[in-house]
């Protein structure tokens, strides 16, 4: 059954997520698979009973949210297909950027006696009862720590150029070899002062195994798997014990490995870490 879409929004609402995954791990994984579509301002995840299996991803650009929704709809994430739709209202962070943010006194509204409700008020409340999710987009989720406590990988990246997709571009669910996933940072989009990873000085001959360097401390096997498993032929990620900054990614053949290397070369996992990819030595 198709998921009904509302008006395009900077924020996408995701449900049917695996409830057994820890909150911090879920945030990192969501960032890993959605950052390819554009700049992420925030990710909201709560472990409260009411909000389990749900999350909100807030993009800087509406076009990024649209591409993410259409490309990742039904994507198997922790063995469950994601259900994605636009959030029904702007999140607080977007409302503040637009200048439309209105502070809400939640405590006072909560204590409001029922006897003061007029028939018109009751009707309005009942009419909005079908969309309990909206409140979570508009402000902090109850029981959730402030986003300042989120992993560093989730933070807004000042100065990073936002992803601007070509007009009318809608990425397909699967990527053919050689296609660049939307939002993957090409070398020319690195931060000022950083040298673009043009052509390595000593390029190894093609190999079905890729060698990754300049990875941030937060990197784990799952995050890299989420990035690379969108490419045909992906087999596995291998980390090096005692080294968080390097990893190996194996594909079925050299052509498939080369397509993934070209697409994700220079991908910025964090503000200061542009991933460098080369063929592993044989």
From Swiss-Prot:
Residues modified to Phosphothreonine: 131
Annotated Gene Ontology cellular component terms: nucleoplasm; nucleus; spliceosomal complex; U1 snRNP; U4/U6 x U5 tri-snRNP complex
GO molecular function, one term: RNA binding
Effect of residue 16 to V: Substantially reduces RNA binding
SS bond list: none
Matching Pfam families: RRM_1
Protein name: U1 small nuclear ribonucleoprotein A
Species annotation: Homo sapiens (Human)
Lineage: Eukaryota, Metazoa, Chordata, Craniata, Vertebrata
Gene expressing this chain: SNRPA
